């Protein structure tokens, strides 16, 4: 399966999960391809909080986002009145969410999320959607 098809499938999976959690949610049409404007992959809100989400998936290798991709997400979010979030999912794991400012920035100005970082530091789905919070081992 091509990475684009897999990414599209993962985006739809995230949209369905957010819908089941009570959010009004939509996948931005042609995000990243058929428009000159940079759009987030997913818009979601529950009447109290609104998110513009860039969704990325990987089999286990680190996930990279370009600096421009993250800057465009932050810009859109500010203008739209939403909170910018990066959603990452690794095979056989759940979704984890990050504020763009919490991501590791490479020397080249790109952003990176490793699987172990997502599992240790990412906000889990239940916490993100207002459910029970994740208990982290060794945390305060």
From Swiss-Prot:
Keywords: DNA damage, DNA recombination, DNA repair, DNA-binding, Endonuclease, Hydrolase, Magnesium, Metal-binding, Nuclease
Annotated catalytic residues: 31
SUPFAM superfamilies named among the record's database cross-references: Restriction endonuclease-like
Pfam families cross-referenced by the UniProt entry: Hjc
GO biological process terms on file: DNA recombination; DNA repair
Enzyme Commission (EC) number: 3.1.21.10
Top-rank lineage group of the source organism: Archaea
Reactions this protein catalyses: Endonucleolytic cleavage at a junction such as a reciprocal single-stranded crossover between two homologous DNA duplexes (Holliday junction)
Needed co-factor(s): Mg(2+)
Single GO MF annotation: DNA binding
Marked site: Transition state stabilizer: 56
Residues involved in Mg(2+) binding: 11, 41, 54
Disruption phenotype: No alteration in sensitivity to UV light, slow growth on mitomycin C. No effect on homologous recombination; double hef/hjc deletion mutants cannot be constructed (synthetic lethality), suggesting the enzymes play overlapping roles.
Gene3D superfamilies, alphabetized: 3.40.1350.10
Cofactor detail note: Binds 1 Mg(2+) ion per subunit.
Known function: A structure-specific endonuclease that resolves Holliday junction (HJ) intermediates during genetic recombination. Cleaves 4-way DNA junctions introducing paired nicks in opposing strands, leaving a 5'-terminal phosphate and a 3'-terminal hydroxyl group that are subsequently ligated to produce recombinant products. Has a role that partially overlaps that of Hef endonuclease; double deletions cannot be constructed. In the presence of site-directed mutations that (probably) abolish Hef helicase or nuclease activity, a hjc deletion cannot be constructed.
Family the UniProt entry places it in: Belongs to the Holliday junction resolvase Hjc family.
PANTHER family with a match to the protein in the record: HOLLIDAY JUNCTION RESOLVASE HJC (PTHR39651:SF1)
Subunit structure: Homodimer.
Protein name, UniProt field: Crossover junction endodeoxyribonuclease Hjc
């Amino acid at each position: 399966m091509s990475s684009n098809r897999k990414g599209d499938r993962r985006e739809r999976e995230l949209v369905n999960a957010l819908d089941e959690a009570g959010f009004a949610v939509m996948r931005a049409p042609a995000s990243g391809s058929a428009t000159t404007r940079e759009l987030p992959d997913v818009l979601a809100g529950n009447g109290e909080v609104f998110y513009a989400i860039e969704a990325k998936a990987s089999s286990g290798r680190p996930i990279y986002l370009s600096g421009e991709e993250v800057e465009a997400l932050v810009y859109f979010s500010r203008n739209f009145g939403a909170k910018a979030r990066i959603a990452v999912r690794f095979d056989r794991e759940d979704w984890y969410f990050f504020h763009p400012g919490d991501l590791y920035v490479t020397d080249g100005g790109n952003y990176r999320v490793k699987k172990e970082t997502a599992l240790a530091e990412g906000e889990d789905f239940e916490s993100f959607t207002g459910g029970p919070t994740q208990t982290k081992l060794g945390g305060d």
